[in-house]
Amino acid sequence: MATDIKVDNSASYQELKARLHRTVIDRLNLESLQGLKRETASAAIRNLLTDMLNREGVPMSAAERREIVDSILHEIFGFGPLEPLLADETISDILVNTHDQVFIERDGVLHPSGIRFKDDNHLAQIIDRIVSRVGRRIDESSPMVDARLPDGSRVNAIIPPLALDGPHLSIRKFRRDALSDEDLVRFGSITEPIVEVLRGAVKARLNVLISGGTGAGKTTLLNVLSSFIPHNERIVTIEDSAELQLRQEHVVRLETRPPNIEGKGHVDQRQLVINSLRMRPDRIVVGEVRGAEAIDMLQAMNTGHDGSLTTVHANSPRDALARLETMVSMSGLRLPASAVRHQISSAIDVVIQIARLSDGRRVLLTLSEVVGMEGDVITMQDIFIFERMGIGENGKVLGRFRPTGIRPRFTDRLLVSGVKLPPGLFEDTPPRGGMSPRATDLRSVPVPPATRPIGRRA
């Protein structure tokens, strides 16, 4: 007697899907289908599955039939349960903790996905399929893989014995259409006055460092800043995993290469930075500076390659410059700390700190100017800040972007480059009517000081 089956993760649904899957494997020579186009092979299997479902006599709606057929096709040709998540353009991250615990990130907030794998072996098979398609392998001798899918998505996989609870998979999806500065303004990540300053900074060939934590939106902002580079300039991009989507015509994209199975052939970012200097670049854009390449990047900025852009993992502008100092020491060059700080202060013009707030929104926290040196200390001044006022009833972070009232020294360089900013852009004028009554009752968050030394604790 036929029983009603809801197409979900129930045992009855999984049993039916497994039975149909086994029958397809038994009745079709899948190897013979490999030479066919995927559309042709999928159509043949879809027809077979439809006939099999008719024979099963299971009462199912047309939508349920379509879902179960698609699910089996995903198992045969795609990445199994991950396929609908990969196809959903509203999802930015897919995080597989265990075979039955899969989370997604949508609009900066994590949610349970509702999908699951049959068991650890099923998850391991999908991971192996993913990494093998990009020419990589994962096994006990090489239990970690960091790779890029053909569509640009970043994949990180780790398996036992390093992953204690079973195979783990993280996918950072690649946006087909890069966000623009208008998008960031609409999302509340930055304001139009800040965009004007950043556009002018790029045109005037200021060296810009973007700082933030994981998932804060560093690459997104770097992509936006890179879009401001004039189209008649030659750009060389250097990335560990290619994510930038530059629209200019004259772009050379470089990407690091991991070692092969024999442990040979590794090419790191430092080698690419050094090589890029021989490629007659007008601009060098480093996706993220992580190690010894920091010294070569700083030297490039100080020797005629103005207008370079990069990002770094750090929690504040001060930490960002301190991290650069640490990374320079990884190069093996024994330079005095004061000499390294002089290199940094003369190379970096602007530091942008961004963060992901508790409500999932990504915002620019500070736009700071590197002023110079006082003794052996780098000094900075904040030009724009995001002033947090508290948390609203709906969990949204309340706050506003405002200038600090300090006119940056780099405005002279902008004027020389033909960039004229509106008068009063840097004046700190309180919002009309002052702070809203509701906001005054919320807990306040201290605003960072306007000028901060780098090289000693505040």
Please name every model-derived segment.
Residues 88, 96, 101, 105-204, ...:
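P-loop NTP-binding catalytic core
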Residues 210:
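Hydrophobic anchor at the beta1->P-loop junction of P-loop NTPases
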Residues 218:
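Conserved lysine of the Walker
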